[in-house]
UniProtKB/Swiss-Prot annotation:
The protein, known as: Calcium uniporter regulatory subunit MCUb, mitochondrial
Pfam family, one: MCU
Family: Belongs to the MCU (TC 1.A.77) family.
Subcellular location: Mitochondrion inner membrane
Presequence extent in this chain: 1-44
Physiological role: Negative regulator of the mitochondrial calcium uniporter (MCU), a channel that mediates calcium uptake into the mitochondrial matrix. MCUB is required to limit mitochondrial calcium overload during stress. Acts as a dominant-negative regulator that displaces MCU from the functional uniplex complex and thereby decreases the association of calcium sensors MICU1 and MICU2, preventing channel gating. Mitochondrial calcium homeostasis plays key roles in mitochondrial metabolism.
Tissue: Detected in lung, brain and heart, and at lower levels in white fat, skeletal muscle and spleen. Detected at very low levels in kidney and liver. Highly expressed in macrophages during the progression of skeletal muscle regeneration.
Spans traversing the lipid bilayer: 229-249, 259-279
Keywords from the UniProt entry: Calcium, Calcium transport, Coiled coil, Ion transport, Membrane, Mitochondrion, Mitochondrion inner membrane, Transit peptide, Transmembrane, Transmembrane helix, Transport
Organism: Mus musculus (Mouse)
């Protein structure tokens, strides 16, 4: 082999030329023996040496990884392609940007693959995106999709910013479509909203029920303490009046006790004025009673771990939902009355 390889010349492209592969090879001219080159054409045969895989490794494919989530557009609609965790199959979801929301998209994922226990969408900086956000708004920027505690970075294609006239026309079209949809499906929308409000009211009442029980117990104790304090004040004033009468008629004379009663009345006026400066409220028995009741209530709430802010928030939400439900039912009644009147005519 070394002798055979010594007669071969390596070509730049990794090809090796063998002496046995030449047809009628031409020898170099010897000393004093010049020969002319033959006129017949020469055929050069080449043989490939080396590892062919080395050259094939330079070619790279464009196949996407199986676990990558991509967003593409087809016929103007976004296509979200991902791998289902249970079946390990690639699945495409067609997104309607103006109708689909983040919540409906996540629900579609869970309906398609029951192995998806948790799914959420967050922004690139980690802020959670509400379920009511439209997919059109979501696809404007990059975001992250969390499926069963696995995070996937999704990069969205940048869309060309439309002109001002196009945006105005698009907004007008959206408004027109929304009005037409509302007019054609008004009764269905109102009934759906009524069911939603009733479910919300039931949920709020369910949350308020244990809080109401704790609040009633705290109010009863606070009321008892406030009443006891008022009775103690009445007893103190009675003792003061009895002491002044005893000193006036049995111990001293009125001439001596008159200045004492005057300064006592003046001291009471100072106390009332100080109460106004501190509390910014007039000194009345009703305001004093309410203030003392609230003090007892908040102290006992802290001891019982009763969240007053949460209770007030739930009560406000319940009042708002009840008012909205009454408004929806009023609209439904007016609509039914109008239909009945038109049928009679």
């Amino acid at each position: 082999m070394p002798g055979a390889l010594s007669g071969r010349r390596m070509l730049p492209s990794g090809l090796c030329l063998g002496r046995w592969q030449l047809l009628r090879t031409i020898r170099a001219r010897g000393r004093g023996d010049p020969r002319e080159l033959p006129s017949t054409p020469q055929v050069l045969c080449m043989k490939l040496y080396g590892n062919p895989k080395y050259h094939q490794a330079l070619h790279y494919g464009t196949v996407e990884p199986q676990d990558e989530i991509t967003v593409t557009y087809k016929h103007g609609l976004p296509l979200v392609t991902l791998t289902l965790p249970s079946r390990k199959e690639r699945c495409q979801f067609v997104v309607k940007p103006m109708l689909s929301t983040v919540g409906s998209f996540l629900q579609d994922l869970q309906n398609e693959d029951k192995g998806i226990k948790t799914a959420a969408i967050i922004t690139a900086d980690g802020s959670e995106i509400p379920a009511s956000t439209l997919m059109d708004t979501l696809l404007m920027t990059d975001f992250k999709l969390i499926i069963n505690k696995l995070r996937y970075d999704i990069r969205c294609h940048k869309k060309e910013e439309p002109s001002g006239e196009h945006m105005t026309e698009l907004e007008n079209t959206k408004s027109l479509v929304h009005r037409l949809f509302t007019i054609l499906h008004l009764e269905e929308i109102q009934k759906r909203r009524e069911r939603h409000l009733m479910a919300k009211i039931d949920h709020l009442q369910e949350q308020l029920r244990p809080l109401e029980q704790v609040k009633a117990a705290i109010e009863a104790r606070s009321e008892a303490n406030t009443s006891g304090l008022l009775w103690a004040g009445l007893a103190l004033l009675s003792v003061q009046g009895g002491a002044l009468a005893w000193l006036t008629w049995w111990v001293y004379s009125w001439d001596i006790m008159e200045p004492v009663t005057f300064f006592l009345s003046f001291a009471n006026s100072i106390v009332f004025f100080a109460y106004f400066i501190i509390t910014r409220q007039n000194y009345t028995y009703s305001s004093l009673r309410s203030r003392q009741f609230l003090q007892f209530f908040h102290k006992k709430s802290q001891r019982r771990c009763f969240d007053v802010e949460q209770y007030n928030k739930l009560k406000e939400d319940l009042a708002e939902a009840t008012e909205s439900l009454e408004s929806v039912r009023r609209s439904l009644r007016l609509r039914i009355q109008g239909e009945e009147a038109s049928e009679k005519n």
